[in-house]
Amino acid sequence: MAKRSLSNLSVEDLCGKRVLVRVDFNVPLNEEGSITDDTRIRAALPTIQHLIEKEARVILSAHFGRPKGKVNEDMRLTPVSQRLSELLGKTVVKTESCIGPDAEKKVHEMSNGDVVLLENVRFIGEEEKNDSEFAKKLASLAEVYVNDAFGAAHRAHASTEGVTNYLSPSVAGYLMEKELKYLQGAIDSPQRPLAAIVGGSKVSSKIGVLESLIDKCDKVLIGGGMIFTFYKARGLSVGKSLVEDDKLDLARALEKKAKEKGVQLLLPSDVVLADNFSPDASSQMVQIDSIPEGWMGLDIGKESVKLFQDALADCKTVIWNGPMGVFEFDKFANGTNSISTTLAELSAKGCCTIIGGGDSVAAVEKAGLASKMSHISTGGGASLELLEGKVLPGVAALDDEI
């Protein structure tokens, strides 16, 4: 069922109203406490700016880190409020706590178009327990609820799910709407052929995604460390490469399922090996049936890159989740960088390219190609769960489209 979004609300719905907006401001900080990547803050700007223009009173709720229900001075949202003030060109008032007298006072003093950022919602232990009393207190600060935190939508927490019981309307923000349009759209009604590229180190973390994508895709391309579990399941020697021995039967079952469904499941034909796990390790490129003892695979080989490029050439929709190798080490980044370049080229030809969260986003950004993709997801776990076909509590709780 489609969800109501901010675009469905009129000026009358928003002007002068106190609007609680759940955002994802869980940004990386360096040792000095400065933000090193403000992508998530920028991603929320369209929703915040729209509410300011419509003269709403904007109350932002966010989490940062994992303080485990206690105040942690290193996890306060002060750097976020400062950066947001710069981006908006106006003062963002931060509260001492997300509920209580200080929050109530600062919200009460708001004028139309003002922005208040509530302190880290996870400083309160009841947030992650989705406690109804805490949700009620948080909701009492506002009249309207907007969820724009796709990255936290897979959590049934008080600020993502509980507050919707006390606030109406409860709608999706622009970022949430865009995420659902691309990710849900790619799963439910894609332009075909639809391909998924799944990487990363472990089969175990992508079981649900692989099973779901084999059901929905025309082609599934597998890279990253998980390929060695598939190779070992085929009886090949994999040297010191990462293998999940308890997932060998699963790997066989996934290959069997793809074959039965007529889905093209592609594994690399060659790999780049290292003699140890380090950026300056000795390396060699070999066919997958020629991996010597004492060596480990850290990237897909050049032949495999060409194999994958050929498979993707006619695709109209491509979802990518997980790198092809240890792209953090330049010597083992070619597979991942080549896929980034290929997807950028496909985008230019009209293919819908979706980067489904996590390390693949970092890889595309490192390659300087993020702007060339159709959609870069801001959610790691949320993207995975949506691709698995799971219901996201933070989305399910929003009002259905009328």
Swiss-Prot record:
Where is the protein found, in the record's own terms? Cytoplasm
Domain of life (superkingdom): Bacteria
Q: List keywords of the entry alphabetically.
A: ATP-binding, Cytoplasm, Glycolysis, Kinase, Nucleotide-binding, Transferase
Which range is the signal sequence, renumbered to this chain?
none
| GO biological process: one example | glycolytic process
Catalytic activity line of the entry:
(2R)-3-phosphoglycerate + ATP = (2R)-3-phospho-glyceroyl phosphate + ADP
Keyword Isomerase, does the record have it? no
Any one Gene Ontology MF annotation carried by this entry is: ADP binding
Q: What is its main location?
A: cytoplasm
Provide GO CC annotations from the record: cytosol
- The EC number(s) attached to this protein equal 2.7.2.3
Positions contributing to ATP binding: 206, 297, 328, 357-360
Q: Give the quaternary structure.
A: Monomer.
UniProt similarity note:
Belongs to the phosphoglycerate kinase family.
Spell out the protein name for this chain. Answer: Phosphoglycerate kinase
Species of origin: Prochlorococcus marinus (strain SARG / CCMP1375 / SS120)
